[in-house]
A protein has these predicted regions:
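Detector for short helical micro-motifs
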Residues: 1-97
Protein backbone atom coordinates (compact mmCIF):
# COMPACT_ATOMS: atom_id res chain seq x y z
CA UNK A 1 0.00 0.00 0.00
CA UNK A 2 1.20 3.51 -0.84
CA UNK A 3 2.02 5.76 2.10
CA UNK A 4 -0.48 8.56 2.63
CA UNK A 5 1.16 11.77 1.33
CA UNK A 6 -0.92 14.09 3.52
CA UNK A 7 -1.95 14.81 7.08
CA UNK A 8 -4.50 17.20 8.52
CA UNK A 9 -2.91 20.47 9.51
CA UNK A 10 -4.84 22.48 12.07
CA UNK A 11 -3.41 25.90 11.35
CA UNK A 12 -4.99 27.62 14.37
CA UNK A 13 -3.54 25.03 16.76
CA UNK A 14 -0.16 25.32 15.03
CA UNK A 15 -0.20 29.12 15.19
CA UNK A 16 -1.11 29.17 18.89
CA UNK A 17 1.35 26.37 19.71
CA UNK A 18 4.25 28.14 18.02
CA UNK A 19 3.32 31.73 18.84
CA UNK A 20 6.50 32.38 20.80
CA UNK A 21 8.81 30.54 18.39
CA UNK A 22 11.12 32.62 16.27
CA UNK A 23 10.55 32.42 12.52
CA UNK A 24 13.61 30.18 12.29
CA UNK A 25 12.29 27.82 14.98
CA UNK A 26 8.88 27.72 13.29
CA UNK A 27 10.50 26.71 10.00
CA UNK A 28 12.61 24.08 11.73
CA UNK A 29 9.58 22.68 13.51
CA UNK A 30 7.42 22.41 10.40
CA UNK A 31 10.27 20.63 8.60
CA UNK A 32 10.62 18.20 11.52
CA UNK A 33 6.87 17.53 11.45
CA UNK A 34 6.97 16.87 7.70
CA UNK A 35 9.87 14.46 8.07
CA UNK A 36 8.13 12.68 10.95
CA UNK A 37 4.99 12.35 8.82
CA UNK A 38 7.04 10.76 6.05
CA UNK A 39 9.51 8.58 7.97
CA UNK A 40 8.03 8.04 11.44
CA UNK A 41 10.12 8.24 14.61
CA UNK A 42 13.48 9.94 14.11
CA UNK A 43 16.86 9.82 15.85
CA UNK A 44 18.24 12.99 17.40
CA UNK A 45 20.98 13.21 14.74
CA UNK A 46 18.42 13.50 11.96
CA UNK A 47 16.47 16.21 13.77
CA UNK A 48 19.71 18.12 14.32
CA UNK A 49 20.41 17.96 10.57
CA UNK A 50 16.89 19.15 9.76
CA UNK A 51 17.26 22.04 12.21
CA UNK A 52 20.84 22.71 11.10
CA UNK A 53 21.93 23.08 14.70
CA UNK A 54 24.01 21.36 17.37
CA UNK A 55 21.21 21.17 19.93
CA UNK A 56 17.49 20.74 19.33
CA UNK A 57 15.86 24.04 20.33
CA UNK A 58 13.98 23.66 23.63
CA UNK A 59 10.75 24.95 22.09
CA UNK A 60 10.85 22.13 19.51
CA UNK A 61 12.03 19.55 22.01
CA UNK A 62 9.04 20.43 24.18
CA UNK A 63 6.71 19.40 21.34
CA UNK A 64 8.32 15.97 20.88
CA UNK A 65 8.32 12.74 22.85
CA UNK A 66 10.82 9.90 22.88
CA UNK A 67 10.01 6.23 22.45
CA UNK A 68 11.71 3.28 24.17
CA UNK A 69 14.53 3.33 21.59
CA UNK A 70 15.18 7.03 22.17
CA UNK A 71 13.66 8.07 18.84
CA UNK A 72 11.60 11.25 18.68
CA UNK A 73 7.98 11.55 17.57
CA UNK A 74 5.12 14.03 17.77
CA UNK A 75 2.07 12.57 19.49
CA UNK A 76 -0.53 14.83 17.86
CA UNK A 77 0.81 13.99 14.40
CA UNK A 78 0.63 10.26 15.14
CA UNK A 79 -2.94 10.61 16.43
CA UNK A 80 -4.00 12.49 13.29
CA UNK A 81 -2.30 9.98 10.99
CA UNK A 82 -4.02 7.09 12.78
CA UNK A 83 -7.43 8.78 12.53
CA UNK A 84 -6.90 9.52 8.84
CA UNK A 85 -5.80 5.94 8.10
CA UNK A 86 -8.91 4.61 9.85
CA UNK A 87 -11.13 6.97 7.90
CA UNK A 88 -9.55 6.06 4.55
CA UNK A 89 -9.86 2.37 5.38
CA UNK A 90 -13.55 2.79 6.23
CA UNK A 91 -14.16 4.59 2.91
CA UNK A 92 -12.47 1.76 1.00
CA UNK A 93 -14.57 -0.78 2.86
CA UNK A 94 -17.77 1.13 1.99
CA UNK A 95 -16.79 1.18 -1.69
CA UNK A 96 -16.57 -2.62 -1.74
CA UNK A 97 -20.13 -3.03 -0.53
Amino acid sequence: MVKDPAFLFYFNDFTVGTMYFTNEETGQYIRVICRLADKGHLPEEEILKICNCQKIPNCILGKLKQDEQGLFYQQRLENEQTKRASYVKSRRYNLKE
